[in-house]
A protein has these predicted regions:
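Short alpha-helical segments that sit at the start of domains
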Residues: 39-71
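C-terminal regulatory/oligomerization modules of transcriptional regulators
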Residues: 2-30, 37-48, 154-186
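DNA-recognition alpha helix
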Residues: 83-95
Length: 186
């Protein structure tokens, strides 16, 4: 069941963001060194959203229709997507006016609860590959094609914890981005 009913125009707009169905890495669990490119089929997206709804309900959080729509568009995006791109897609899919602050509040919710990440370099958003697992990740950003891969390894968390303890620094957010050229573009 798809709760986000897109109009024909918004479907055309979103087609550029739809990833290929066979590029999803179902084995990635961030338990050891791993890299993940989150690209999901429609069925996987529906299962992911159902799980997130269930998790939010269990935690007493509201996963509103707008939050779901924003999250769905981010899951559909083949590359990181900006807030105003999301706003444009939402506007084209709705008869109502969607105000930028409501989109930003939805993005803040998704960020705060680990469902999406925001790249510091481009301010664009993309879905977390393991939203139910708390982890510190680095992001490999290709300068040629714009692809982003999420990378996680236990040593990243260990190193950051050691730095925090040795400097008595209370970290509030961590964004690690490596910019370069992906294997496909080399």
């Amino acid at each position: 069941m798809i709760l986000f009913d897109m109009t024909q125009r918004s479907i055309q707009s979103a087609r550029n963001f739809i990833p290929s169905a066979n590029s999803y890495d179902a084995n990635c669990r961030h338990l050891s060194m791993s890299m993940c490119r989150l690209q999901m089929t429609a069925e996987q997206i529906e299962a992911q959203i159902a799980q997130i709804k269930q998790d939010c309900q269990a935690q007493g959080l509201r996963f509103t229709a707008l939050r779901e729509q924003v999250y769905r568009l981010i899951l559909l995006a083949a590359q990181p997507i900006g807030a105003y791109e999301l706003l444009d897609l939402l506007q084209s899919a709705s008869e109502k006016v969607v105000a930028p602050p409501t989109v930003y509040r939805s993005l803040e919710f998704l960020l705060r609860h680990g469902l999406v990440h925001q790249l510091n370099s481009s301010k664009a958003f993309f879905a977390c590959s393991q939203p139910t697992d708390r982890h510190v990740a680095a992001f490999l950003v290709c300068r040629c094609c714009g692809e982003v891969q999420e990378f996680s390894h236990p040593s990243i968390q260990t190193m950051l914890t050691e730095v925090e303890q040795s400097t008595n620094f209370a970290t509030q957010s961590i964004i690690i981005e490596l910019s370069g050229i992906c294997q496909r573009c080399q």
